[in-house]
Amino acid sequence: MLHSSHRPYPRGARVAHLLREEIAAVLPRLHGMSSGLSPLPPSITMVDLPTDMRSATVYFSLMDGPDRADTIREVLQDHAGEIRQLLGRRLALRRIPPLHFVYDARFDRGAEMAELLAHLPPAPEDLP
């Protein structure tokens, strides 16, 4: 028999999902950060949180491609302490883990693959 407090997935996964949503929500509110993130702000794609929850790897993507990835990562990392403070005010967690920002290149690889597939010759109609 399941208890009403049973969760469908582990606490770490729930916290990682919550952190992803909340980091995305606080980015526009960071003081002085908007100039470093314009013209298009990053999208938070995933948060990886180990079972001990002592650190969080925050993956982000950019709508305009990877050219600004290093610059944006530096801006985000420079504001990681401020982001943690804002998260601490918003979330009922005992401790907000240190945040480490990493560019998520999965979407770039997907776009490259779509481009390659678009340039393939059409398949022959009759196959033996």
Curated annotation (Swiss-Prot):
GO terms for cellular component: cytosol. It comes from the Bacteria. Its main location: cytoplasm. It is found in: Cytoplasm. One of its GO terms (biological process) is maturation of SSU-rRNA. Monomer. Binds 30S ribosomal subunits, but not 50S ribosomal subunits or 70S ribosomes. This is Ribosome-binding factor A. It comes from Acidithiobacillus ferrooxidans (strain ATCC 23270 / DSM 14882 / CIP 104768 / NCIMB 8455). The gene is rbfA.
